[in-house]
Each structure stands twice: as structure tokens, then as C-alpha cells.
Amino acid sequence: MWCLPKDDSKAVITAQDQIHSAHRECHLQLPETAILFFMGKATDYLISQYNATELPEPLPRFLNSCPIWEIGKFQLCFADGGRGAPQAVDTIETLAALGVRNIISVGMCGAYDEVVHVGEIIAPQKAFVEEGTSLHYYEDIEYSKPDGNLQKAVTSLLGIRNYSIVSTDAVYRQTLCKEQLWRDKGAVGVDMET
């Protein structure tokens, strides 16, 4: 029982509820664009290199609030997106409830195809869904795709290549058989947040 097409009942808790809960009252004013990092030291680098300012309140997501920073001259904010699909979606829904409209996710994937080299930056053209969180949002979904305009801009600006990946939440269930099925679909790597 995942996404029920005829279920129009209210959610028990929403990101908006979390933001304005009895535990806290959030007054964050965020820019329209946020960058989420799903890897360790990326936020530390931006803080040191771009004179980022930590906002006075943490991002009040349900699964562990976290600091959020702003780089004023770029009209964007950034934060750690968490680990795994549930925390990624929690972060995205919280940002959306706070008025953020554009979210760019930056993370790492484990490549299992030699066409991708260690340290290479790629832009996923498709992310095949192998995790459970997406199934709470879509009745039937095989893969997700990024915004086409953003995909083109990032690819041309950074001079990177596009490949398909797989997003999973079962680290220890990546079998050689599954890997071959993913390769047959054109995927070159696997992550946990896309």
C-alpha cells in the first residue's frame, strides 16, 4: 500500500506543520534556489571559499534539523540534504514549504560501468527508482528525470556528460544480477538520494 490514487485525506503531519510546531516557530526567509549536498565536506568547502553566512535558525526538517547557509551575492542557500531518500525528501519538502522553488541536488554515486571514471562529474539524465520513498508520491514510476532546461544548462556550463543512474535504499541488496539489469537499461551507477 504505497500511493493510493483515491486518497485525498489530509496527511497526519506535513512540512508546514513541522515548521510551525509546538517545538519551534520558524522564521527563515530563504531565496528561491537551494543547493543540497548529499556528501560530507562540500558545505565546509563553500563556507570557507565563498564567505557563506549561516542563517540564525536551522532548517527545521523532521529528520534532524541542520544548519543552512546563504551566499548573498548569488541569491541562493545551501545545506546538507541528508542521507537516503527519506531524509532527502524531508529536506526538499521543508524547503518547498519555506518558499524555495528551485532545488539542485549534488551527490555521489557508485559507478559500476567503466565509462565513468573515479571523480568524474556526471548529470543524471534518468534515475531509475529502486527505493520506497518515491512510491509514496507516485502511483507508478519507473524513473525520474531532471528539469530539461536545468539539465542543458548544467551540462553545457560544466562540460559534463549525461548518464542514467539507479537510486536505491537497500545498500546490501545490490546484486550482480540487478547490476546487469541496470546496465541493460543504460544506467552506469547507483546512489541513494535521487
Placement of each model-derived feature along the sequence:
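Accessory terminal and edge-of-domain segments that mediate assembly/interaction
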Residues: 1-104, 110-194
